[in-house]
């Protein structure tokens, strides 16, 4: 994982920010050693965080604070965190949590409510008020969009379009695309920003090549595929992309904000939702054959793109750092980034609703007062202007408006131009304790549709019936 680039430049900036934010570092007569144990998924954003902490953090209390992190592979992360929490071992003071886990782990007594910490700290309150509401609501609130806060954003994330400039901007490909579709093949990031799903589908069809076919002026060394997005059975790897299609088509998933009167049946399987799922499924014909096996998750599409087997990939920003690193990517110098495609409305504008990625920090309920004080100071440092800029300079993202609206933010990474407009289109799925049952059954049903075993209507009828029954039993839907 590459954590290179501009970190040394920002050391002084971070130090200055700490002094400004906290009024300097106290030096008590007897400094204590405080260890904060944290569980995190192992990927670039958390590695960058640890690197910044090791190089720059000094506790305002004057204590010697150590951040002891367990880096856990993403595929195992939920299982291992859940096992630790339910075992009663109380190993972690903090964790980076997926937003969907909030309800289950809050109701089980593991995640601490933080309203009192926010109310007691004007600086922290001001920082959160400077945060875009979409990620703040997604990462912090339970119930979703309530005033009950449980998390601080660690790495906000959204889906964007990764594409191969050497392929789509090639003169021969440009000429042949115009001849076939009577329209220009988008090339520049600005042109790609205006790509709707219809053009995306055409590009997917156009760039399907077999080994030996001409591709950008030379024979393809391997089979080459037009497009990819998440369509895997594991965890939430089809649900998130499908949610975006449903919202763009004017449909909805079951909305916990409408409880207890909002139903699943008639909403989850509405005509708009069925049309959206059909749309999602139609595009899979221009994807690598692994899509028909249930194995095309976010990590697999990322791998395929970095191996040079895709023209375009709809992927979370959190994986982009490896794409521009020549040590991990064959296309590091042949890639550009644009906003995710959308559905073009009658007014000609693109509707880009999408399921937000990213994760918050959470505090465990058993953390003592001394640990909580150090955690809050750590979080304030993390969300401070200097640290957020340093994180962005190293490949991360910030949900703080005054940070990402700073003109220099655009210079840190080529995908940052997509960030501010993309945040406007983010929604989240369920935060309720029953999320896992909802997710597992939905993933199973979507996999049947993706692999060609049942149609879109049957799939959504099955999901709607299951959700209606489960949510009634749980008291989230009342007659």
Predicted regions and their residues:
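Short, solvent-exposed loop/beta-turn-alpha elements that line the ligand-binding surface or hinge
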Residues: 116-131, 175-192, 229-232, 236, ...
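A structural signal for short loop-to-beta-strand junctions that line the ligand-binding cleft
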Residues: 83, 90-93, 123-168, 347-354, ...
């Amino acid at each position: 994982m590459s954590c290179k680039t501009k970190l040394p430049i920002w050391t002084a900036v971070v130090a200055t920010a700490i002094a400004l934010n906290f009024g300097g570092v106290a030096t008590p007569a007897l400094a204590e050693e405080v260890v904060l144990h944290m569980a995190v998924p192992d990927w670039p954003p958390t590695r960058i965080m640890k690197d910044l902490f090791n190089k720059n953090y000094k506790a305002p209390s004057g204590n010697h604070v150590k951040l002891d992190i367990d880096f856990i592979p993403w595929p195992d992360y939920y299982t291992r965190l859940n096992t630790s929490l339910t075992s009663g071992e109380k190993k972690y003071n903090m964790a980076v949590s997926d937003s969907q886990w909030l309800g289950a782990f809050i109701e089980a007594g593991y995640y601490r409510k933080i309203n009192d910490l926010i109310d007691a700290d004007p600086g922290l309150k001001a920082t959160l008020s400077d945060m875009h509401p979409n990620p703040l609501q997604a990462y912090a609130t339970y119930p979703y969009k309530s005033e009950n806060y449980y998390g601080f954003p660690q790495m906000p994330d959204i889906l964007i379009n990764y594409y191969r400039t050497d392929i789509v901007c090639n003169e021969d490909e440009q000429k042949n695309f115009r001849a076939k579709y009577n329209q220009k093949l988008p090339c520049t990031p600005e042109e790609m920003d205006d790509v709707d799903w219809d053009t995306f589908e055409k590009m997917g069809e156009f760039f399907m090549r077999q080994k030996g076919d001409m591709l950008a002026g030379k024979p393809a060394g391997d089979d080459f595929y037009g497009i990819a997005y998440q369509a895997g059975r594991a965890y939430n790897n089809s649900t998130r992309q499908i949610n975006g299609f449903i919202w763009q088509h004017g449909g909805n998933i079951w909305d916990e904000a409408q409880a207890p009167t909002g139903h699943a049946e008639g909403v989850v399987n509405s005509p708009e939702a069925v049309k959206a799922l059909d749309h999602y499924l139609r595009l899979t014909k221009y994807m690598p054959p692994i899509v028909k096996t249930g194995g095309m998750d976010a990590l697999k599409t990322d791998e395929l793109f970095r191996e040079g087997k895709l023209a375009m990939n709809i992927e979370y920003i959190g994986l982009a750092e490896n794409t521009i690193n020549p040590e991990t990517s064959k296309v590091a110098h042949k890639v550009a980034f644009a906003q995710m495609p959308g559905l073009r409305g009658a007014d000609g504008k693109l509707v880009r609703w999408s399921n937000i990625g990213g994760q918050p920090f959470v505090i465990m309920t058993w953390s003592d007062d001394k640990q909580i004080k150090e955690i809050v100071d750590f979080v304030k440092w993390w969300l401070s202007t200097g640290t957020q800029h340093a994180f962005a300079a190293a490949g991360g993202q910030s949900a703080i408006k005054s940070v990402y609206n700073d003109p220099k933010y655009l210079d840190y990474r080529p995908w940052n131009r997509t960030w501010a407009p993309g945040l406007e289109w983010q929604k989240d799925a369920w935060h309720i304790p029953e999320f896992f049952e909802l997710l597992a059954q939905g993933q199973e049903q979507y996999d049947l549709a993706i692999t060609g075993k049942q149609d879109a209507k049957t799939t959504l009828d099955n999901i709607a019936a299951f959700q209606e029954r489960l949510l009634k039993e749980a008291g989230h839907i009342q007659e």
